Each structure stands twice: as C-alpha cells, then as structure tokens.
C-alpha cells in the first residue's frame, strides 16, 4: 500500500516522515519529495535492490533542469559527495523498515541534513549485518530546481558556509536555515 502523509509546514518534514514510517506496515520505506518524479527506470532499480537482499537501503543521484552555471557547479559537488560518502539526498531515501526503526528514523533535532545523518546510521546498521547502503546512479531522480531559482548564488553559498562553519548550531535552528525556512516559494 502507498500512503501519503502531508504536513502543514516545511519545518515538520522530519516529523511527518517519522510519523508516516510509524504507521507503515511494509518491510521497506520509500520517502520521496513531492516536487520529485520517480521514473520507471529508477523504480525498477529500487525493486531490484530490494529483491537482491544485499542492501539496507539506497538513495539516488538527482537530475535538475535549468540550473545556472553556479548552481550546476554546486550540484555536481553534491553529486560527487553523495556518491563518495553514500549519502542519500533528502529528495529520495529508501530503506528497510526494521533498520529505520532501529536507528531512530530521521533525527528530530535537525531541520536540514537529516537525510545525511540517516544515511550514516543506516550504513552502520547495515555493516553489522553484512548489508550495504548504496546510491543508485543509472536513472537519476528528476527533482525541482526551485530553490536554486529562488535564491542567488551568494545566498546559497552563504547558507552552505554557515553549515560548514557551525554545523550543529545551524542545522538545529530554523532561523539559521533561511534557504529552507524563510518562506520564499
């Protein structure tokens, strides 16, 4: 069964995801952003991963149309880090439901990058059981470039710099995460 759990405020996303997972009855969970398109090739890749029984979960590379040059540059940096460190992007996280519950789900204290923390937790859980967490690359998830179009390169770079210099303080305070929470739509 497929269930959707809408939320009133974007700051509730991690709460909505955890609430949805708590109500889910399946062996696997799939979290996908509303502004993303799960294409048939990617869905087939996910189903193969589930059937092979060798993975605790996965994320996917992303594809965004219409990025400015600086947005494409930042996007390629993220893509490289995602593949290298096996970090799922928040737009798509797939995992075993028992693993999700055992690691505590999405971190309730983080307003951004909770998918990275979850990726790390799932990798550790999987290692203990001989399972891997992978990033699928053959059929990227189509997702929106909306945030890149709403903010200047300077604003996005400043946001990234705040996260790098003061990660805990920034990621735990919505006021420090203007690109996600200042209300621009």
How would you label these PLM feature ranges?
Residues 99-104, 109-130:
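A short, conserved alpha-helix in the catalytic core of glycosyltransferases
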Residues 2, 57, 61-66, 78-98:
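A recurrent flexible, glycine/aromatic-enriched loop bordering the glycosyltransferase active site
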Residues 40-70:
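Conserved donor NDP-sugar-binding/catalytic core segment of glycosyltransferases
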Residues 124-185:
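Hydrophobic helical membrane-anchoring modules
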Residues 3-10:
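Short, small-residue-biased leader/transition segments that mark boundaries at the very start
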Residues 33-37:
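The conserved acidic donor/metal-binding loop of glycosyltransferases
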Residues 13-22:
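Short, conserved alpha-helix that lines the donor NDP-sugar binding/gating region
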Residues 29:
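Short aromatic/hydrophobic "clamp" motif used to bind/position activated sugar donors
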């Amino acid at each position: 069964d497929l269930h959707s759990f809408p939320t009133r405020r974007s700051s509730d996303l991690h709460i909505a995801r955890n609430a949805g997972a708590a109500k889910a009855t399946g062996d696997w969970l799939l979290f996908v952003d509303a502004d993303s398109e799960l294409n048939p090739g990617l869905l087939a890749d996910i189903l193969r991963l589930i059937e092979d029984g060798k993975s605790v979960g996965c994320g996917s590379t992303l594809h965004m149309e219409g990025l400015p040059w600086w947005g494409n540059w930042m996007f390629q940096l993220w893509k490289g880090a995602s593949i290298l460190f096996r970090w799922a992007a928040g737009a798509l996280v797939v995992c075993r439901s028992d693993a999700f519950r055992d690691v505590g789900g999405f971190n309730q204290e983080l307003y951004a990058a909770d998918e990275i923390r979850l990726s790390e937790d799932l990798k550790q859980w999987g290692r203990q059981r001989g399972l891997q967490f992978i990033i699928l690359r053959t059929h990227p998830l189509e997702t929106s470039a909306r945030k890149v179009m709403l903010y200047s390169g300077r604003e996005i770079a400043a946001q990234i710099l705040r996260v790098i210099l003061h990660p805990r303080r920034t990621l735990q305070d919505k006021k420090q995460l203007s690109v996600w929470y200042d209300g621009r739509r």
